[in-house]
Amino acid sequence: MRNFTFKGLFLAAMFMVLGSLAIQAADNDGLITKQIIVKLEKAGTLPDRIGSTKRNKITNLKIIGEINGTDWRVIREMAGRSYYNDGTDGKLAILDLSEAKIVSGGGSYLYDDSYTNDNELGSCAFLNCSGLTSLSLPSGITSIDWNAFSGCSGLTSLTLPSSLTSIDSGAFSGCSGLTSLSLPSGLTSIGDGAFRGCSGLTSIYVYTEKLPNMGSGKFSIEVQKFEGFQAL
């Protein structure tokens, strides 16, 4: 009898703990805060892997595999921006694409003229995704297109891959939350106004022994590229 009572008390305690966890989850508006890992066997299948009911609840996501424009449209929706750049209920804050690969194909991810290309972070890829705080880019990308991160004011952590060779104009404009940025040694060009409005940026690290001279056609940084960079 005592043994039975002990088990009963143990089970009751377990139910109390589980109930407490359930309440905590409810208090968090039902958001999924643990990292969700999605492995795609084929580009364009992210909409099938993450249903519409869960897209607005995931806050931490890692994608493994090839992704195209169809997938990118979903990523933008999860990060708070729609196909027409309107706000969504998406709460995605942390995104890890370090084991993903951007490929061409699929539909447009923004309006009717934004498509993915192999190993390129497309123009306006994260335009106005201000809720995004941390991002690791695919290890194989070679370029970041114009306005890719424009308006990402909440972004505080960004990992750029060593394969990166060019950053286009306005790429990081308005990223006021960034305080530091490490540029890979293979970077050869930075477009006009790439860091315009990055008012919180206090340090930029460039991992190379020697920068090519201005006007060499390989690497040139002009004042307007860092307009609003108060610490420069």
Specify the residue positions occupied by each region the protein language model found.
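Structural signature of tandem-repeat unit edges
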Residues: 33-41, 59-67, 87-119, 130-143, ...
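A structural signal for leucine-rich repeat
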Residues: 75-82, 109-114, 217-219
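Boundary at the C-terminal end of the N-terminal hydrophobic targeting segment
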Residues: 22-27
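Consensus positions within tandem repeat domains that build extended binding/scaffold surfaces
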Residues: 122-125, 145-150, 168-173, 191-196, ...
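Bacterial N-terminal signal peptides that target proteins for export
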Residues: 1-11
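Short, T/G/N/S-enriched strand-turn elements that build extracellular solenoid repeat scaffolds
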Residues: 44-54, 71-80, 216
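Bacterial N-terminal signal peptides
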Residues: 9-20
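A generic local structural motif
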Residues: 2, 47-49, 221, 230
